[in-house]
Amino acid sequence: MTENRGRIGAGEDTAAVVAALHELIAGQAVADWQAVITAVQELDHVGAGPVGYWGMSMGCGLGVPLLAAEPRIRAAVLGLLGVHGLAEAAARVTVPVRFLLQWDDDLVPRDQGLALFDALASAEKTLHANPGKHGEIPGFEMDSSLRFLARHLG
């Protein structure tokens, strides 16, 4: 993390630094998440029902590659991230997606967030934009996101 802060402090593009970090982590995280899904679905009290994904910011950066690779995930709530480094994986995401964007995000440029939403190949996707900075998601969006997942997984 200190190295990344130094790169950003030296003037390197923040989006490129964050995208490189996500790519590094996602390489292992996708396999780890797939193993977790398999293990949980093997539990007698869980079974092989549909799976949902909820990920904001870094969770979105890891979630887009996971959604592109994992057919057991049937719906997702994503957001607070831009397209940099994710366009190819986003083009393979076809499940229903609810995308949250903070209009005044101080970390993710609005046009980059909108570009990620646009890059998602999902036929059923909705964009939910709210005033506020990165991470200041209104409580009603959390409640509504849970209803979205319940509707698609239930």
Regions found by a protein language model. Give the residues of each.
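Conserved alpha/beta-hydrolase
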Residues: M1-A10
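Alpha/beta-hydrolase active-site loop
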Residues: G9-D44
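Primarily recognizes the serine-hydrolase "nucleophile elbow" in alpha/beta-hydrolase
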Residues: Q34-R92
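Short beta-strand/loop motif that positions the catalytic acidic residue
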Residues: V93, F99-L101, D105
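Short alpha-helix in the alpha/beta-hydrolase fold that links the catalytic acid
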Residues: V95, P109-D118
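Acidic catalytic loop of the alpha/beta-hydrolase fold
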Residues: W103-V108, G135-E136
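Catalytic histidine neighborhood in serine/cysteine hydrolases
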Residues: L114, D118-G135
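Catalytic active-site module of serine/aspartate enzymes centered on a nucleophile-bearing elbow/loop
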Residues: P131, P138-G154
